[in-house]
Amino acid sequence: MRKSLLAILAVSSLVFSSASFAADLEDNMETLNDNLKVIEKADNAAQVKDALTKMRAAALDAQKATPPKLEDKSPDSPEMKDFRHGFDILVGQIDDALKLANEGKVKEAQAAAEQLKTTRNAYHQKYR
């Protein structure tokens, strides 16, 4: 009986701890916004790379979420496909900026990161 109880507690703690690792959409959006500000103020490639890496992870995680405006839509709906496509675009732009940062081109990476704002604004207008 005691071993069963311990096993149940162990499994339930794993389930609850793994659920806390997945950030919600709002947290991911905040991560994207905060790190975009870091990129704008950065003065070295390491800062830019770190911020872009965090942004990439947040964008990929956010892509799996459903925005409140689309909660009544099926995952295969055109709107949800477009929502996810927006993150594909964003991740591509992040990758382009990351490539520049890896080459030590800080100013160019910052300029490339400016495109993220255009994508953000377009998709916020649709789904926020």
Curated annotation (Swiss-Prot):
Pfam families: Cytochrom_B562 (PF07361). Keywords: Electron transport, Heme, Iron, Metal-binding, Periplasm, Signal, Transport. Residues 60-82 are annotated as: Disordered. The keyword Amino-acid biosynthesis does not apply. InterPro entries: Cyt_b562 (IPR009155), Cyt_c/b562 (IPR010980). It is found in: Periplasm. GO terms for biological process: electron transport chain. Its cofactor is heme b. Residues 69-82 have a biased composition (Basic and acidic residues). The keyword Lyase does not apply. Coiled coil: none annotated. Residues 1-22 form the signal peptide. Binds 1 heme b (iron(II)-protoporphyrin IX) group per molecule. Belongs to the cytochrome b562 family. Monomer. Electron-transport protein of unknown function. This is Soluble cytochrome b562. It comes from Escherichia coli.
